[in-house]
């Protein structure tokens, strides 16, 4: 399980009305949907560098199945080994689609609402379905 952290001042998070409660809700659903799986919370590179704060801290690692990861592994390598990807609005969700995942999305990023994601809050204005190739081409 891969849960993606984002920085607190990320424009995509702010546009999705993301806050501490939404990130906590996302982690809760990841635990509920996959109760026996290990959850890796991938910190943002700028959080790791000490430049911008993220939403998740060690306090969110409430069991031995949840851990923060701020290492150098490629996001592609992390996704390859993940059974699911959770994000609010990170572009990692788009990359997850390209990698063959159907990410769980809790915000309103450009890639949500086209039938390629599990949307916690469906995007009502998007009424048609796209393939991953169509979404990639549009972007």
Question: What residue ranges belong to the model's regions?
Answer:
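Short loop/turn segments at strand-loop or loop-helix junctions that form parts
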Residues: 2-10, 43-44, 108
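A donor-sugar binding/catalytic signature common to diverse glycosyltransferases
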Residues: 72-117
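Short acidic-hydrophobic, aromatic-tinged amphipathic segments that line or gate anion-handling sites
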Residues: 66-72, 124-127
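Catalytic donor nucleotide-activated moiety binding site of glycosyltransferases and closely related
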Residues: 27-70
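Leloir-type glycosyltransferase catalytic cores
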Residues: 14, 115-139
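Histidine-anchored nucleotide/phosphate-binding helix
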Residues: 3, 16-33
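Short secondary-structure boundary/capping segments
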Residues: 17-21, 55-58, 101-103, 118-123
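Short, solvent-exposed loop/turn segments at secondary-structure junctions
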Residues: 10-12, 49-50
């Amino acid at each position: 399980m891969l849960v993606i952290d984002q920085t607190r001042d990320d424009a995509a998070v702010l546009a999705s009305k993301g806050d501490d409660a939404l990130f906590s809700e996302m982690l809760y659903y990841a635990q509920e949907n996959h109760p026996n799986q290990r959850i890796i919370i991938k910190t943002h590179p700028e959080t790791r560098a000490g430049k911008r704060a993220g939403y998740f801290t060690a306090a969110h690692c409430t069991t031995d199945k949840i851990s923060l990861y701020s290492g150098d592994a490629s996001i592609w390598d992390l996704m390859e080994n993940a059974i699911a990807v959770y994000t609010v609005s990170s572009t990692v969700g788009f990359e997850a689609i390209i990698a063959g995942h159907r990410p769980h999305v809790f915000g309103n990023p450009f890639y949500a609402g086209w039938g390629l994601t599990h949307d916690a809050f469906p995007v009502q204005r998007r009424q048609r379905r796209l393939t991953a190739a169509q979404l990639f081409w549009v972007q």
